């Protein structure tokens, strides 16, 4: 077995803690939009509509399937990399399940980071209230509006009410028609370890039928002793089954 410096072993543990929330950050789902400027709503109104639309979409999502690609690279000494391809299934009755189709690269990163990340996502899905993007967990401040690929969006600053490794602070982009989170740029609310100096997360969502689901993620973690870990997730193309016929106007 090759020798791994202590900083690499620490990195695998710390990266896992930092990345736990990536899939918890939001499960936001929605419907269509136009290119006009969004209505002049307050932050409280936007958050209220987002929470109600999110709940309606969650209640109406019965099942989805996708083929995901997880990759992690440690740029330091020694340089390490690993990837896994995963079949992901969600069922409203039983939650999430994963099946690893293929894996390659560093066994240390596969076992200690990528596989544990899947297990964390599976377990965390059982209790989403403590990590959900709601007024129970965060404060919100309206920062303006932007167009994202022709779709108007509200930009909000978010601050967690408590320090937690599974919550974050940063900005969210809320689709102005669907009131679904379209993008997140953030950092963990609490540094998971002294050995980590900074973590930056970029998370994007895609509209699939009437639902908004994770599309891609990039998380970069800098280690105090030197080196950088980069995790990327490509969530693939979704096959979605709604629980009921979607209303013409969406959820």
Describe the function of each predicted region.
Residues 1-12:
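N-terminal secretory signal peptides that target proteins for export/translocation
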Residues 13-26:
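Bacterial N-terminal signal peptides
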Residues 31-169, 176-181, 189-199, 206-213, ...:
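Structured extracytoplasmic
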Residues 2-4, 30-33:
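Intrinsically disordered, low-complexity and often Lys/Arg-enriched segments
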């Amino acid at each position: 077995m090759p020798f791994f410096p202590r900083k690499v072993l620490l990195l695998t543990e710390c990266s896992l803690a930092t990345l736990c929330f990536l899939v918890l950050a939001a499960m936001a789902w929605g419907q269509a939009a136009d290119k006009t400027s969004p209505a002049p709503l307050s932050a409280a109104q936007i958050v209220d509509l987002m929470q109600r639309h999110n709940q309606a979409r969650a209640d109406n999502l019965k099942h989805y399937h996708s083929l995901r690609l997880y990759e992690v690279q440690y740029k330091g000494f020694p340089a390490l990399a690993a990837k896994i391809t995963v079949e992901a299934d969600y069922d409203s009755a039983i939650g999430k399940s994963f099946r690893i189709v293929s894996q390659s690269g560093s066994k240390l990163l596969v076992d200690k980071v990528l596989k544990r990340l899947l297990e964390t996502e599976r377990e965390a899905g059982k209790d989403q209230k403590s990590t959900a993007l709601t007024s129970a967990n965060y404060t919100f401040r309206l920062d303006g509006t932007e167009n994202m690929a022709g779709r108007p969006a509200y930009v909000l600053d978010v601050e967690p009410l408590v320090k937690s490794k599974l919550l974050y602070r940063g900005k969210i982009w809320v689709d102005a028609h669907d009131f679904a989170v379209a993008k997140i740029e953030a950092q963990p609310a609490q540094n998971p370890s002294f050995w980590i100096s900074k973590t930056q997360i970029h998370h994007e969502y895609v509209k699939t039928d009437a639902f908004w689901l994770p599309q891609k993620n990039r998380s970069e973690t800098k280690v105090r002793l030197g080196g950088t870990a980069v995790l990327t997730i490509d969530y693939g193309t979704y096959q979605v089954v709604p629980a009921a016929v979607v209303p013409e106007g969406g959820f």
